[in-house]
């Protein structure tokens, strides 16, 4: 009989991840990569729809570009942090912007991690897994 702990482990492998990027090709590539690793995905193409979708879907993790129309990534991070319902969602910034200055600003604004495009697929997946485990009720004690 499954326990609460094993149910939680199983749910992490099917966790819903929200992709926020204005590039449709990148959204599709990330969606395919994440689904191949048993994650569910939803996506938004701008800052305004990102907040609305996060409120509706309650993803377990958000992958966020900084250069977005209708509200840049920093404004999205700020709004997520200001929301009691959304502030605990880990956010991984994935952007074409230079790390110098942007990485520190992103982390200070509440991001969990920062990647410059193109990101290493394996490293990104590793950070996604670690972020989901840290955000789970069981913390880092979950098996990988």
Q: What positions do the PLM features span?
A:
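Short hydrophobic/Thr-rich beta-strand motif most characteristic of the beta2 strand and flanking loop
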Residues: 38-45, 53
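Non-catalytic signal-transmission and effector/linker regions of two-component phosphorelay proteins
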Residues: 1-16, 122-144
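Active-site beta3 strand of CheY-like receiver
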Residues: 57-63, 68
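Alpha4 helix (beta4-alpha4-beta5 surface) of REC/receiver domains from two-component response regulators
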Residues: 75, 98-115, 122-126
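The feature encodes the CheY-like receiver
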Residues: 27, 69, 87, 99
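Acidic catalytic/metal-coordinating carboxylates
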Residues: 46-49, 60, 72-78
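Charged docking surfaces used in two-component/phosphorelay signaling
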Residues: 28-36
């Amino acid at each position: 009989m499954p326990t609460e702990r094993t149910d939680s482990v199983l749910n992490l492998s099917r966790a819903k991840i929200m992709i926020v990027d204005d590039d449709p090709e990148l959204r599709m590539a990330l969606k395919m990569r994440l689904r191949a690793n048993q994650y569910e995905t939803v996506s938004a193409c701008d800052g305004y729809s990102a907040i609305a979708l996060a409120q509706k879907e309650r993803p377990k993790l958000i992958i966020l570009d900084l250069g977005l129309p209708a509200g840049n990534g920093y404004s999205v991070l700020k709004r997520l942090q200001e929301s009691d319902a959304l502030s605990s969602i880990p956010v991984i910034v994935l952007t074409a912007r230079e790390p110098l200055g942007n990485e520190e600003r992103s982390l200070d604004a509440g991001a969990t991690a920062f990647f410059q495009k193109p990101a290493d697929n394996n490293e990104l997946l590793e950070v996604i897994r670690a972020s989901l485990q840290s955000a789970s009720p069981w913390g880092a004690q979950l098996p990988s």
